[in-house]
Amino acid sequence: MRMQTKLIHGGINEDATTGAVSVPIYQTSTYRQDAIGRHKGYEYSRSGNPTRFALEELIADLEGGVKGFAFASGLAGIHAVFSLLQSGDHVLLGDDVYGGNFRLFNKVLVKNGLSCTIIDTSDLSQIKKAIKPNTKALYLETPSNPLLKITDLAQCASVAKEHNLLTIVDNTFATPYCQNPLLLGTDIVAHNGTKYLGGHSDVVAGLVTTNNEALAQEFDFFQNAIGGVLGLQDSWLLQRGIKTLGLRMEAHQKNALCVAEFLEKHPKVERVYYPGLPTHPNHELAKAQMRGFSGMFSFTLKNDSEAVAFVESLKLFILGESLGGVESLVGIPALMTHACIPKAQREAAGIRDGLVRLSVGIEHEQDLLEDLDQAFAKIS
């Protein structure tokens, strides 16, 4: 089954009892049991609920996993992933990892005895050099947030297996429509379902799946024991959003390429970070391991001091956090999504105060170009 079809018919796509083609919202906290210890598959909605289960089956199907897990936010899902590790374990993280993940690791997980080394994961030699005897996991974002670096997933998975490391991939930017890390040899895939999967800026959710039965059993335990499960309304909304993911991603990508090409030629722009451009250093790798380039990219202005005035002059591009909705968003990572990362570390990774990140929506492309044009005119 092709991905466009699987988005609609994958997982559990109808209600087994009534035949309803949209899985209902089972708005219940508990379930009648036939006898002590004998139930119909559900006991309590933290442990399991048919609406959430349908979503979990869907993400597993889309990514090639054995089981999926839905959490109350993307960070709740990442926390569950890192719960696999123990005190004394070491992790490799990307140098432009999402600020929330950086904060989770460096402010919370370090208290549990975990340590990390920050590297450029798109450089395989850096990964090999950074592996220690106590390294247990390699955490990857590809494309990365916000510099859109592309990491070779197959090569990383091979190196990880040589050293008995878990390979964890945040697939939020690419989505299952454009990239399937498990099929390239990795162990765990995480998504911030708030973004492209939901697609309408009305859900907060996290999804995790794995192709390893033993890991799936551990996630099953963590999800129930920690309790950060996704609510039923959000589970239903996310399933509805996923049905149109293919159509939306095609529109996002078409617009993103158009905007990126416009910016690359603009005299006030220094550099555009978009893997869909032939000038991107990992363009060929992105073409090889992805089926599209997503609608996310960043760019730097030649004058960093103009960045704030520029983004505040935009009208269609909404100044705000998040990404992946049908509406276009703009932000300055150094001052917003990545502000929790120390300035020196941000700048060393290339996240300057003048770096602007765009989540290109599905509006008419000409309207987006005109909005950018008028914002540039105001800072000229």
Swiss-Prot record:
Transmembrane segments: none
Claim: Cytoplasm is one of the keywords in the record: yes
Protein keywords: Amino-acid biosynthesis, Cytoplasm, Methionine biosynthesis, Pyridoxal phosphate, Transferase
Its EC number(s): 2.5.1.48
Domain of life from the UniProt record: Bacteria
PROSITE patterns, alphabetized: CYS_MET_METAB_PP
Entry cofactors: pyridoxal 5'-phosphate
Cofactor binding note: Binds 1 pyridoxal phosphate per subunit.
MF (Gene Ontology): cystathionine gamma-lyase activity; cystathionine gamma-synthase activity; pyridoxal phosphate binding
InterPro entries: Cys/Met-Metab_PyrdxlP-dep_enz, Cys_met_metab_PP, PyrdxlP-dep_Trfase, PyrdxlP-dep_Trfase_major, PyrdxlP-dep_Trfase_small
One of the GO biological process terms: transsulfuration
CDD domains in the record: CGS_like
Enzymatic reactions: O-succinyl-L-homoserine + L-cysteine = L,L-cystathionine + succinate + H(+)
Subcellular compartments: Cytoplasm
Pfam families, alphabetized: Cys_Met_Meta_PP
Presence of keyword Transmembrane helix: no
Positions of modified residues (N6-(pyridoxal phosphate)lysine): K195
Gene Ontology CC annotations of this record: cytoplasm
Physiological role: Catalyzes the formation of L-cystathionine from O-succinyl-L-homoserine (OSHS) and L-cysteine, via a gamma-replacement reaction. In the absence of thiol, catalyzes gamma-elimination to form 2-oxobutanoate, succinate and ammonia.
Family of this protein: Belongs to the trans-sulfuration enzymes family.
Complex and partners: Homotetramer.
Protein name as annotated: Cystathionine gamma-synthase
Organism listed in the record: Helicobacter pylori (strain J99 / ATCC 700824) (Campylobacter pylori J99)
